[in-house]
Amino acid sequence: MLDALHLFSFKCFEMLDLPLGKLTVLSGINGGGKSSVIQSLVLLAQTLDEREWSKSLLLNGPSLTLGSASDVINQTTGRRQLGLGASAGNRKVVWTFNAQDRRAMALDLSAVEVNGASLDLSGPIHWLLPEAEAGGCAIVQHLKCISWLSAERTGPRELLPLLDPQHHRQVGMRGELAAGLLHWRESDAVSERLLIEGEPPTLFHQVRARMRQFFPGCDLQILPIEGASAVSLRLRSSAKSEFQRPQNVGFGLTQLFPVLVEVLAASPGDVVIVENPEVHLHPKAQQDIGELLALIASCGVQVIVETHSDHVLNGIRLAVKGRRSVEPAQVEIHFFSRDADGASRRLSPKIDADGRLDVWPDGFFDQFDQALAALL
């Protein structure tokens, strides 16, 4: 598990040491830094995946397109340098990257520190580390296992991609690969703690069962398209209706589907990042997805969720109070805001065994109370 994220001169952050838990909640104002936290992790994962033997940070790739050095280096302190790092157990790795100029589309690896000691970068570099170090580095392995589902998810589509099964490992940043992944892995076993009683313990049946929990009567089919590298997702909203194209059912079904596939398909040791799981879900379903994410985090999968929903937060709090999933010490909650000078600021409320938070910063999921007070 990744225990912390370390950033310097990256986007809005001059310096950030961010604790990560089995379940980490990122909240706060728009433009406060939540997305930058996620992008830093995805940026490292993208580089490790696409440039295994490279000495540069890949700013523009299949997962992220961030532009040039001037777009990612903090404009106040960064000049031509930034740092990205992570901790796991008793090990901390920080990578420093330099740009030849602020228009550069990639940043060169200039230094690597492990527990504060600089490593020799004169030899071959593998996964952003000297070759002898790379294979046994747990931090690198966790970063390589990141799965990211962004807030900009694919809407209803007639056809969805079906990749080679060896490369169809994730749902895709927009969820566009979820149906294909479920097709290839339909018979995979799901963790016993996640099973819905009375349903077969396979991924396909458990995704169907979870969909019915959120949308009673819902069912799904995945149909391979003959002669094409594609599948068709069919949905119905009740047992009495016919299976239909996704365009003809509630939008929330197609938005929740990739979330469920992503979290139920994850393996222990994976890092799952979900942005705005509440999109197009009614309040009860938003609370339920919070409880499910807490349950997923108790099964060895590290979950990082970015949300604007008090219902998602309350679902997590209820899961902690009900002792059905993660322990209070395994949950990290962060609230990002801006000070008068525009610098990013973070407050981190702590949750107790009853699901209560020790502090409630102004602007932290309090809009309902503020509106109610004004109405009264």
Regions found by a protein language model. Give the residues of each.
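Walker B catalytic motif
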Residues: 274-277
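Phosphate-binding P-loop
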Residues: 15-21, 264-268, 295-297
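C-terminal lobe/lid and adjacent interdomain/linker elements of RecA-like ASCE P-loop ATPase modules
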Residues: 76, 288-376
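Phosphate-coordinating catalytic segments in nucleotide- and nucleic-acid-processing enzymes
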Residues: 47-256, 262, 267, 347-376
